[in-house]
From Swiss-Prot:
Official protein name in the record: Acyl-CoA N-acyltransferase verG
First-level EC class: transferase
GO biological process, one term: terpenoid biosynthetic process
Molecular function terms, GO-annotated: transferase activity
Assigned keywords, A-Z: Transferase
Recorded metabolic or biological pathway in which this protein acts: Secondary metabolite biosynthesis; terpenoid biosynthesis; Mycotoxin biosynthesis
Species whose genome carries this gene: Penicillium polonicum
Annotated EC: 2.3.1.-
Disulfide cross-links: none
Amino acid sequence: MAICIYEHDAAKIIPTLVSELPYSTTLLRRIQHGIAYPYETAHILATFPPGLTPEPGQPWLAARVDLFAGRTTQMIIYSSLEAEHTSIPPIVTVSDSTEILNVDSTSNNSKNNDTNDADNPDINSITKFIVSTFSASPPVLALARAQLLALLEYVKTNMLPFYLSYLAKSAQATSVAAETPPVSTSSVTSNNTSPTSVPLIPAPDPQAFLIGSLHTGLFSLLQQSGSYTLSNPIPNIRVHRFDDPPYYKYFFRRSEFSPEAVCGRSADLPFADLSLPSGYRFHDREGREGVLSKHLDLVQSRTHIPRPRAQLSKIPGMAVYLDSTSSDADEMPIAWGFLGVDGALVTLHVEPEHRGRGLAVPLSKAIMRRGMAVDGVFGAGSVNSEDSQTRERVGAWAHTEVAGYNNASRRVMEKIGGQVLTTVTWTVIELLD
Protein backbone atom coordinates (compact mmCIF):
# COMPACT_ATOMS: atom_id res chain seq x y z
CA MET A 1 0.00 0.00 0.00
CA ALA A 2 1.41 3.35 -1.08
CA ILE A 3 1.77 5.89 1.70
CA CYS A 4 0.82 9.46 0.86
CA ILE A 5 2.28 12.53 2.50
CA TYR A 6 -0.02 15.54 2.75
CA GLU A 7 0.66 19.23 3.35
CA HIS A 8 -1.30 20.67 6.28
CA ASP A 9 -2.24 24.08 7.59
CA ALA A 10 -0.31 24.67 10.81
CA ALA A 11 -3.23 25.96 12.86
CA LYS A 12 -5.61 23.21 11.80
CA ILE A 13 -3.39 20.30 12.82
CA ILE A 14 -2.96 21.61 16.38
CA PRO A 15 -6.07 19.92 17.88
CA THR A 16 -4.82 16.52 16.67
CA LEU A 17 -1.45 17.09 18.32
CA VAL A 18 -3.01 18.42 21.53
CA SER A 19 -4.94 15.15 21.83
CA GLU A 20 -1.58 13.32 21.85
CA LEU A 21 -0.02 15.31 24.71
CA PRO A 22 2.35 15.05 26.41
CA TYR A 23 4.23 12.94 23.85
CA SER A 24 3.53 15.30 20.94
CA THR A 25 4.76 18.37 22.79
CA THR A 26 7.93 19.00 20.75
CA LEU A 27 6.16 19.08 17.38
CA LEU A 28 3.20 20.97 18.83
CA ARG A 29 5.39 23.69 20.33
CA ARG A 30 7.47 24.03 17.16
CA ILE A 31 4.31 24.54 15.13
CA GLN A 32 2.95 27.06 17.66
CA HIS A 33 6.15 29.07 17.50
CA GLY A 34 6.06 28.91 13.72
CA ILE A 35 2.56 30.40 13.76
CA ALA A 36 3.74 33.28 15.97
CA TYR A 37 6.89 33.78 13.87
CA PRO A 38 6.14 32.31 10.43
CA TYR A 39 8.73 31.18 7.91
CA GLU A 40 7.80 30.75 4.25
CA THR A 41 10.18 27.81 3.95
CA ALA A 42 8.48 25.74 6.69
CA HIS A 43 6.06 22.93 5.84
CA ILE A 44 3.68 20.89 8.00
CA LEU A 45 3.36 17.31 6.74
CA ALA A 46 1.32 14.29 7.83
CA THR A 47 0.30 10.84 6.64
CA PHE A 48 -3.42 11.68 6.81
CA PRO A 49 -5.32 14.17 4.62
CA PRO A 50 -5.98 17.72 5.84
CA GLY A 51 -9.39 18.24 7.35
CA LEU A 52 -9.59 14.63 8.53
CA THR A 53 -8.59 12.93 11.75
CA PRO A 54 -6.20 9.96 11.67
CA GLU A 55 -7.76 6.54 11.16
CA PRO A 56 -8.37 4.88 14.56
CA GLY A 57 -6.15 1.92 15.33
CA GLN A 58 -3.56 2.81 12.69
CA PRO A 59 -0.25 4.57 13.32
CA TRP A 60 0.21 7.98 11.77
CA LEU A 61 3.01 10.46 11.50
CA ALA A 62 3.32 14.26 11.36
CA ALA A 63 6.27 16.59 10.97
CA ARG A 64 7.43 20.16 10.61
CA VAL A 65 10.16 20.57 8.02
CA ASP A 66 12.27 23.62 7.24
CA LEU A 67 15.48 22.68 5.49
CA PHE A 68 16.49 26.34 5.38
CA ALA A 69 17.03 26.18 9.15
CA GLY A 70 20.49 24.87 8.23
CA ARG A 71 22.60 23.96 11.23
CA THR A 72 19.65 24.36 13.60
CA THR A 73 17.01 21.62 13.66
CA GLN A 74 15.51 21.14 10.20
CA MET A 75 12.90 18.52 11.01
CA ILE A 76 10.71 17.56 13.98
CA ILE A 77 8.82 14.26 13.61
CA TYR A 78 6.06 12.78 15.74
CA SER A 79 4.56 9.31 15.43
CA SER A 80 1.38 8.22 17.18
CA LEU A 81 3.34 5.18 18.35
CA GLU A 82 4.99 7.47 20.89
CA ALA A 83 1.76 7.94 22.84
CA GLU A 84 0.39 4.45 22.22
CA HIS A 85 3.39 2.13 22.42
CA THR A 86 6.36 3.76 24.18
CA SER A 87 8.09 1.33 26.52
CA ILE A 88 10.79 2.58 28.87
CA PRO A 89 12.50 0.83 31.80
CA PRO A 90 12.29 2.45 35.24
CA ILE A 91 14.81 5.25 35.69
CA VAL A 92 16.45 5.62 39.07
CA THR A 93 16.40 9.20 40.28
CA VAL A 94 19.75 10.79 40.97
CA SER A 95 20.93 11.78 44.42
CA ASP A 96 21.37 15.37 45.47
CA SER A 97 24.27 16.95 43.66
CA THR A 98 25.74 20.42 43.29
CA GLU A 99 24.15 22.56 40.60
CA ILE A 100 26.60 22.51 37.68
CA LEU A 101 24.39 24.06 35.09
CA ASN A 102 24.60 24.77 31.45
CA VAL A 103 21.60 22.83 30.20
CA ASP A 104 21.31 22.86 26.43
CA SER A 105 19.46 19.96 24.92
CA THR A 106 20.12 20.26 21.23
CA SER A 107 23.58 18.80 20.96
CA ASN A 108 24.11 16.51 18.00
CA ASN A 109 26.72 14.42 19.73
CA SER A 110 27.02 13.74 23.45
CA LYS A 111 30.76 14.44 23.27
CA ASN A 112 29.97 18.03 22.33
CA ASN A 113 28.61 18.81 25.78
CA ASP A 114 29.89 21.87 27.63
CA THR A 115 31.42 19.70 30.36
CA ASN A 116 34.67 17.82 29.88
CA ASP A 117 33.68 14.15 29.90
CA ALA A 118 36.96 12.91 31.30
CA ASP A 119 36.64 15.12 34.35
CA ASN A 120 32.93 14.54 34.93
CA PRO A 121 32.31 11.94 37.66
CA ASP A 122 28.65 11.72 36.64
CA ILE A 123 29.66 10.18 33.32
CA ASN A 124 32.17 7.75 34.73
CA SER A 125 29.79 6.51 37.42
CA ILE A 126 27.06 5.40 35.00
CA THR A 127 27.56 2.27 32.94
CA LYS A 128 24.11 1.67 31.48
CA PHE A 129 21.77 4.17 29.86
CA ILE A 130 18.05 3.85 29.38
CA VAL A 131 16.60 3.71 25.85
CA SER A 132 12.86 3.91 25.13
CA THR A 133 11.42 1.56 22.51
CA PHE A 134 8.10 0.73 20.87
CA SER A 135 6.14 -2.28 22.11
CA ALA A 136 3.92 -2.50 19.00
CA SER A 137 3.49 -5.63 16.88
CA PRO A 138 5.80 -6.25 13.88
CA PRO A 139 3.13 -5.25 11.31
CA VAL A 140 2.51 -1.95 13.11
CA LEU A 141 6.24 -1.26 13.35
CA ALA A 142 6.64 -2.07 9.66
CA LEU A 143 3.91 0.43 8.77
CA ALA A 144 5.49 3.10 10.96
CA ARG A 145 8.85 2.48 9.26
CA ALA A 146 7.23 2.81 5.85
CA GLN A 147 5.64 6.10 6.92
CA LEU A 148 8.98 7.44 8.12
CA LEU A 149 10.69 6.48 4.86
CA ALA A 150 7.84 8.00 2.85
CA LEU A 151 8.28 11.26 4.73
CA LEU A 152 12.03 11.33 4.06
CA GLU A 153 11.43 10.53 0.38
CA TYR A 154 8.84 13.31 0.11
CA VAL A 155 11.21 15.86 1.62
CA LYS A 156 14.10 14.75 -0.58
CA THR A 157 12.01 14.88 -3.75
CA ASN A 158 9.96 18.01 -3.15
CA MET A 159 12.03 20.22 -0.85
CA LEU A 160 15.72 19.32 -1.02
CA PRO A 161 16.27 20.56 -4.63
CA PHE A 162 15.10 24.08 -3.70
CA TYR A 163 17.36 24.10 -0.64
CA LEU A 164 20.41 22.92 -2.59
CA SER A 165 19.74 25.54 -5.27
CA TYR A 166 19.59 28.20 -2.57
CA LEU A 167 22.91 27.02 -1.10
CA ALA A 168 24.55 27.08 -4.53
CA LYS A 169 23.36 30.63 -5.21
CA SER A 170 24.48 31.75 -1.75
CA ALA A 171 27.93 30.24 -2.28
CA GLN A 172 28.22 31.99 -5.63
CA ALA A 173 27.21 35.32 -4.12
CA THR A 174 29.71 34.83 -1.30
CA SER A 175 32.46 34.06 -3.80
CA VAL A 176 31.75 37.24 -5.74
CA ALA A 177 31.64 39.32 -2.57
CA ALA A 178 34.96 37.85 -1.43
CA GLU A 179 36.68 39.38 -4.46
CA THR A 180 36.01 42.84 -3.01
CA PRO A 181 38.01 43.54 0.19
CA PRO A 182 35.62 44.41 3.03
CA VAL A 183 35.97 47.65 4.95
CA SER A 184 36.14 45.74 8.23
CA THR A 185 36.27 42.05 9.13
CA SER A 186 35.83 42.47 12.86
CA SER A 187 32.34 40.98 12.84
CA VAL A 188 33.14 38.03 10.58
CA THR A 189 33.29 34.70 12.38
CA SER A 190 33.98 31.14 11.35
CA ASN A 191 31.03 28.91 10.51
CA ASN A 192 32.13 26.70 13.37
CA THR A 193 32.50 29.29 16.11
CA SER A 194 30.22 31.67 17.94
CA PRO A 195 30.99 35.42 18.05
CA THR A 196 33.12 34.70 21.13
CA SER A 197 34.96 31.72 19.58
CA VAL A 198 33.05 29.04 21.50
CA PRO A 199 33.17 25.85 19.37
CA LEU A 200 29.78 25.13 17.80
CA ILE A 201 28.28 21.82 16.77
CA PRO A 202 29.05 21.02 13.11
CA ALA A 203 26.60 21.89 10.35
CA PRO A 204 24.88 18.91 8.70
CA ASP A 205 25.76 17.69 5.22
CA PRO A 206 23.49 19.61 2.78
CA GLN A 207 22.19 16.32 1.37
CA ALA A 208 21.20 15.07 4.83
CA PHE A 209 18.51 16.12 7.29
CA LEU A 210 19.10 17.30 10.85
CA ILE A 211 16.22 15.78 12.83
CA GLY A 212 15.68 17.00 16.38
CA SER A 213 14.27 15.27 19.47
CA LEU A 214 13.62 12.07 17.51
CA HIS A 215 12.13 9.28 19.63
CA THR A 216 14.70 6.50 19.96
CA GLY A 217 12.02 4.03 18.90
CA LEU A 218 11.65 5.85 15.58
CA PHE A 219 15.41 5.99 15.08
CA SER A 220 15.61 2.25 15.75
CA LEU A 221 13.16 1.60 12.91
CA LEU A 222 15.91 2.73 10.55
CA GLN A 223 18.21 -0.06 11.78
CA GLN A 224 17.96 -3.59 10.45
CA SER A 225 18.33 -4.91 13.98
CA GLY A 226 15.50 -2.70 15.23
CA SER A 227 17.79 -1.63 18.06
CA TYR A 228 19.25 1.73 18.99
CA THR A 229 22.58 1.26 17.26
CA LEU A 230 24.56 2.53 14.29
CA SER A 231 25.87 -0.87 13.26
CA ASN A 232 23.54 -1.80 10.41
CA PRO A 233 21.06 0.74 9.00
CA ILE A 234 18.40 -0.41 6.57
CA PRO A 235 19.12 -0.03 2.82
CA ASN A 236 19.34 3.51 1.41
CA ILE A 237 19.79 5.07 4.86
CA ARG A 238 23.02 6.69 6.00
CA VAL A 239 23.28 7.91 9.58
CA HIS A 240 25.86 10.69 9.75
CA ARG A 241 25.60 11.08 13.52
CA PHE A 242 23.31 10.53 16.47
CA ASP A 243 23.43 10.79 20.26
CA ASP A 244 24.77 7.73 22.02
CA PRO A 245 23.64 7.59 24.76
CA PRO A 246 20.38 9.37 23.96
CA TYR A 247 18.80 12.21 25.89
CA TYR A 248 16.26 11.70 28.67
CA LYS A 249 13.10 13.66 27.88
CA TYR A 250 11.55 15.16 31.00
CA PHE A 251 7.89 16.20 31.04
CA PHE A 252 6.39 18.68 33.51
CA ARG A 253 2.70 19.02 34.33
CA ARG A 254 1.33 22.53 34.63
CA SER A 255 0.70 21.88 38.34
CA GLU A 256 4.47 21.59 38.80
CA PHE A 257 5.52 24.90 37.25
CA SER A 258 2.32 26.97 37.43
CA PRO A 259 -0.25 25.73 39.96
CA GLU A 260 -3.76 27.06 39.47
CA ALA A 261 -4.06 28.68 42.90
CA VAL A 262 -1.00 30.05 44.66
CA CYS A 263 -1.25 32.30 47.69
CA GLY A 264 -0.09 35.81 46.90
CA ARG A 265 0.11 35.31 43.16
CA SER A 266 -1.61 37.82 40.87
CA ALA A 267 -1.56 38.88 37.25
CA ASP A 268 0.66 41.81 38.24
CA LEU A 269 3.07 39.57 40.15
CA PRO A 270 3.15 36.29 38.18
CA PHE A 271 6.39 35.11 39.81
CA ALA A 272 5.74 36.24 43.39
CA ASP A 273 5.51 32.69 44.71
CA LEU A 274 8.84 31.65 43.18
CA SER A 275 11.25 32.38 45.99
CA LEU A 276 14.78 33.22 44.97
CA PRO A 277 17.51 33.20 47.62
CA SER A 278 18.09 36.48 49.40
CA GLY A 279 20.00 38.94 47.25
CA TYR A 280 18.66 37.75 43.90
CA ARG A 281 15.75 39.00 41.79
CA PHE A 282 13.92 38.28 38.52
CA HIS A 283 14.32 41.84 37.23
CA ASP A 284 17.01 44.42 36.72
CA ARG A 285 17.21 47.67 38.67
CA GLU A 286 14.72 49.26 36.27
CA GLY A 287 12.17 46.51 36.86
CA ARG A 288 12.59 44.84 33.47
CA GLU A 289 12.12 41.06 33.37
CA GLY A 290 13.52 38.55 30.93
CA VAL A 291 16.70 38.44 28.88
CA LEU A 292 17.30 41.83 27.26
CA SER A 293 18.78 42.30 23.80
CA LYS A 294 21.99 43.70 25.26
CA HIS A 295 22.50 40.39 27.11
CA LEU A 296 22.38 38.14 24.04
CA ASP A 297 26.11 38.28 23.33
CA LEU A 298 26.73 37.02 26.87
CA VAL A 299 24.16 34.24 26.40
CA GLN A 300 25.74 33.16 23.11
CA SER A 301 29.19 33.11 24.67
CA ARG A 302 28.13 30.46 27.21
CA THR A 303 26.78 27.80 24.82
CA HIS A 304 28.00 25.74 21.87
CA ILE A 305 24.49 25.57 20.40
CA PRO A 306 24.27 27.86 17.33
CA ARG A 307 21.23 29.95 18.22
CA PRO A 308 21.24 33.26 16.31
CA ARG A 309 20.42 36.49 18.13
CA ALA A 310 17.25 36.79 16.05
CA GLN A 311 16.05 33.43 17.34
CA LEU A 312 16.95 34.16 20.96
CA SER A 313 14.95 37.39 20.78
CA LYS A 314 11.83 35.44 19.72
CA ILE A 315 11.72 32.81 22.46
CA PRO A 316 10.45 33.29 26.02
CA GLY A 317 13.19 33.64 28.58
CA MET A 318 13.88 34.75 32.13
CA ALA A 319 16.98 36.04 33.89
CA VAL A 320 18.19 36.36 37.47
CA TYR A 321 20.05 39.43 38.73
CA LEU A 322 22.21 39.98 41.79
CA ASP A 323 21.47 42.79 44.22
CA SER A 324 24.40 45.15 44.25
CA THR A 325 25.27 48.60 45.52
CA SER A 326 26.95 49.31 42.20
CA SER A 327 25.18 51.72 39.85
CA ASP A 328 26.83 50.22 36.78
CA ALA A 329 24.57 50.95 33.80
CA ASP A 330 25.58 47.65 32.18
CA GLU A 331 23.90 45.44 34.78
CA MET A 332 24.20 41.86 33.58
CA PRO A 333 22.28 38.75 34.69
CA ILE A 334 24.01 35.96 36.56
CA ALA A 335 21.62 33.22 35.40
CA TRP A 336 19.18 32.79 32.52
CA GLY A 337 17.27 30.35 30.40
CA PHE A 338 14.68 30.06 27.63
CA LEU A 339 11.98 27.90 26.17
CA GLY A 340 13.28 27.10 22.71
CA VAL A 341 11.35 27.23 19.45
CA ASP A 342 10.17 23.70 20.25
CA GLY A 343 9.12 24.65 23.78
CA ALA A 344 11.99 22.83 25.49
CA LEU A 345 13.81 24.37 28.43
CA VAL A 346 17.15 25.34 26.87
CA THR A 347 20.28 27.38 27.52
CA LEU A 348 19.65 27.17 31.27
CA HIS A 349 22.85 28.65 32.65
CA VAL A 350 24.05 29.76 36.08
CA GLU A 351 27.38 31.56 36.28
CA PRO A 352 29.96 29.44 38.17
CA GLU A 353 30.26 31.70 41.21
CA HIS A 354 26.49 31.52 41.82
CA ARG A 355 25.98 27.77 41.46
CA GLY A 356 24.79 25.64 44.34
CA ARG A 357 22.57 28.41 45.74
CA GLY A 358 19.17 27.13 44.67
CA LEU A 359 18.67 29.38 41.65
CA ALA A 360 18.00 26.76 38.97
CA VAL A 361 14.64 25.43 40.19
CA PRO A 362 12.78 28.75 40.60
CA LEU A 363 14.37 30.06 37.40
CA SER A 364 13.23 27.00 35.45
CA LYS A 365 9.68 27.31 36.76
CA ALA A 366 9.59 31.01 35.88
CA ILE A 367 10.71 30.28 32.33
CA MET A 368 8.06 27.58 31.84
CA ARG A 369 5.39 29.77 33.42
CA ARG A 370 6.15 32.65 31.07
CA GLY A 371 6.09 30.54 27.90
CA MET A 372 3.01 28.50 28.84
CA ALA A 373 0.92 31.41 30.14
CA VAL A 374 -2.38 32.06 28.39
CA ASP A 375 -0.81 35.00 26.58
CA GLY A 376 2.50 33.19 26.08
CA VAL A 377 3.69 31.92 22.71
CA PHE A 378 2.79 28.34 23.73
CA GLY A 379 -0.35 29.15 25.72
CA ALA A 380 -4.07 28.91 25.01
CA GLY A 381 -4.16 32.38 23.51
CA SER A 382 -2.05 31.16 20.60
CA VAL A 383 -4.61 28.53 19.56
CA ASN A 384 -7.37 29.43 17.12
CA SER A 385 -9.90 26.87 18.33
CA GLU A 386 -13.39 27.09 19.78
CA ASP A 387 -12.93 23.77 21.56
CA SER A 388 -12.51 24.57 25.25
CA GLN A 389 -10.77 21.27 25.96
CA THR A 390 -8.13 21.95 23.32
CA ARG A 391 -7.50 25.43 24.70
CA GLU A 392 -7.30 24.08 28.25
CA ARG A 393 -4.87 21.28 27.40
CA VAL A 394 -2.56 23.08 24.99
CA GLY A 395 -0.43 24.69 27.72
CA ALA A 396 -0.68 21.84 30.20
CA TRP A 397 2.79 20.38 29.64
CA ALA A 398 6.35 21.62 29.38
CA HIS A 399 9.45 19.56 28.63
CA THR A 400 13.19 19.45 28.23
CA GLU A 401 15.89 17.00 27.21
CA VAL A 402 18.88 16.24 29.44
CA ALA A 403 21.86 13.98 28.84
CA GLY A 404 21.51 10.82 30.93
CA TYR A 405 24.96 11.32 32.43
CA ASN A 406 24.29 14.94 33.47
CA ASN A 407 23.27 14.17 37.04
CA ALA A 408 23.29 17.79 38.19
CA SER A 409 20.82 18.90 35.54
CA ARG A 410 18.74 15.75 35.97
CA ARG A 411 18.44 16.48 39.68
CA VAL A 412 17.13 19.98 38.95
CA MET A 413 14.50 18.55 36.61
CA GLU A 414 13.46 16.04 39.27
CA LYS A 415 13.14 18.79 41.88
CA ILE A 416 10.74 20.62 39.58
CA GLY A 417 8.69 17.43 39.30
CA GLY A 418 9.76 16.25 35.85
CA GLN A 419 9.23 12.67 34.74
CA VAL A 420 11.19 10.86 32.03
CA LEU A 421 8.68 9.32 29.62
CA THR A 422 10.87 8.86 26.53
CA THR A 423 14.43 9.10 25.28
CA VAL A 424 15.36 11.06 22.16
CA THR A 425 18.25 11.88 19.86
CA TRP A 426 19.41 14.62 17.53
CA THR A 427 20.50 12.86 14.39
CA VAL A 428 21.64 13.64 10.85
CA ILE A 429 20.16 11.18 8.37
CA GLU A 430 20.60 10.93 4.61
CA LEU A 431 18.26 9.09 2.26
CA LEU A 432 20.38 7.59 -0.51
CA ASP A 433 19.30 7.03 -4.11
